[in-house]
Every structure is written in structure tokens, then in C-alpha cells.
A protein has these predicted regions:
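Non-heme Fe(II) oxygenase metal-center motifs and adjacent flexible, charged/small-residue loops
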Residues: 1-151
Length: 151
């Protein structure tokens, strides 16, 4: 399966700082979207990505991306089965902050992966382009940072 998972990609202190930045960035955002609580986007024709990049850990610059989506999931929230837009590149990177999460790949057989605080998940190939993925309801507050590139 073309998936790479790094469970402790960020330190506990980096997670705490970044979760605080996520909360600050979402203050005033009221839009609820598709099972998530709040969403904010940078890059492409969204908000200025470079403005926020100055505040996130240097190691994020190692990820090849030109767009970033910040998702907030309060307890019980999730994102339903979907395939990310084909307008994005072949590989997607997800950093998980806060409570644990279970990502589900709706393949045969179904694959589940637990995502911990500070973990980095990347997936590509058929998992990216033809197999739907979702998350199970969050047991507590969680943020995800989704890094993508244009095709």
C-alpha cells in the first residue's frame, strides 16, 4: 500500500505551539464544512501561504506543497468518504495534531490507520487517486494540516 506514516514527526512541544497557532488562525472562522468544524486554506488563490509559513516549524519546508488546508474537528466530528480533487498532485501529506484520529481507506479489504498527535501521513498512487478515504468521529479536539501541490 503506497502509504508512509511517521508517528512522532513533531515533538510534543512543537505540537503544543502549532495547535495554539491553529486555534488562533481559526478564531473568527465560523464556516462549518463537510463534517469538520472549521476550515481555512492557504496557497493557490486562497490566503497568503508565506505569511503563515513563517510561524510553522522549519521541517514543514521539507514537504513539497503549494497549498495548505487547516481542518478543525471537535469531538464527534469527521470527514466522510472522499477522493481529494484530481487538480492536486499525486501525493498528499497530512499532519495530525491533538486527539487521536482513525483514517479509513475504503479499499478491499478496508484499511484503518491510527494517527497520533504530531504524526505525518503521506499517501499516493491508487490510495490517492481511486480509493476513497475518511476519518472516524474524533474522540476529542483535533486539527489536521493537509499539504498538497497542483498537478
Amino acid at each position: 500500500m503506497p502509504i508512509e506514516y511517521k508517528p512522532y514527526w513533531l515533538s510534543v512541544s512543537e505540537c503544543a505551539v502549532l495547535a495554539g497557532e491553529c486555534k488562533r488562525e481559526l478564531d473568527g472562522v465560523v464556516k462549518k464544512a463537510n463534517g469538520r468544524t472549521r476550515v481555512k486554506r492557504w496557497g493557490w488563490d486562497y490566503l497568503d501561504l508565506e505569511r503563515w509559513l513563517g510561524e510553522i516549524p522549519e521541517k514543514f519546508r521539507l514537504i513539497p506543497f503549494d497549498s495548505l488546508t487547516l481542518n478543525e474537528y471537535e469531538e464527534g466530528r469527521f470527514i466522510g468518504p472522499h477522493i481529494d480533487s484530481m487538480g492536486y498532485g499525486d501525493r498528499i501529506f497530512v499532519v495530525s495534531l491533538g486527539g487521536p484520529a482513525t483514517i479509513v481507506f475504503h479499499s478491499e479489504p478496508v484499511e484503518r490507520l491510527q494517527l497520533g498527535n504530531g504524526s505525518l501521513l503521506s499517501f499516493w498512487g491508487k490510495e490517492r487517486t481511486s480509493i476513497k478515504h475518511s476519518t472516524e468521529p474524533s474522540p476529542g479536539l483535533r486539527y489536521s494540516l493537509v499539504f498538497r501541490n497542483k498537478r
